Amino acid sequence: MTHMPVVLLGTGLYTPKDSISNDELVATFNQYVAQFNQEHAADIAAGTVEALAESSSAFIEKASGIKSRFVVDKAGILNPNIMKPQFAPRSNDELSLQAEIGVAAAKQALDNAGVNAADIDMVIVANSNMQRAYPAMAVEIQSELGCGGFAFDMNVACSSATFGVQMAANAIAAGSAKRVLIVNAE
């Protein structure tokens, strides 16, 4: 029995335009801590609420090695009253934000591989978190790029991408696909 060789032809990466340094993140967090502690001063003094402690850039770097991170929505994250990304809701008829990120990375990967989207016959999205359950992100990406074949999402927690690669290799080895696009849009 002859097995078709399985090779990785190209990779792509989506990098958001904005980044947040530890100093920026800590300044926002510490502003939130000051507001929280001030608003709950009486309860903190009574011992019914624990005061929040400030953080530092040095602590984040020592604990995680991270000095900065790329983000899609800097304004929401750096607002001490929000401290999370703010995204406009999208209907199921619109491309999800994660699918949009996946499409950008997939286009890069296809360009790097010298492969046309129409030559892809299997699309796997392997994420640990999905923005929404329906429509399947893989189908969104398949449709947006113009890929053929079939598409499905995989969710195997932190191992999703690894399982996606294994699933693609198995599909190629079994002959059910010739060219597989694997996307992790996280």
Residues covered by each model-derived region:
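Short glycine-aspartate micro-motif
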Residues: P5, M122, K178-I182
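Short glycine-rich phosphate-binding loop at a beta-alpha junction
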Residues: A118-A126
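Conserved "HGTGT" condensation-loop signature of ketosynthase/thiolase-family condensing enzymes
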Residues: M1-D119, L145
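Conserved catalytic cysteine-centered active-site region
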Residues: S64-I82, D93, N127-V180
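Short beta-strand segments
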Residues: L9-G12, A126, N155, V180-E186
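Short linear motifs at secondary-structure transitions and domain/linker junctions
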Residues: A46-G47, Q98-I101, M130, V156-C158, ...
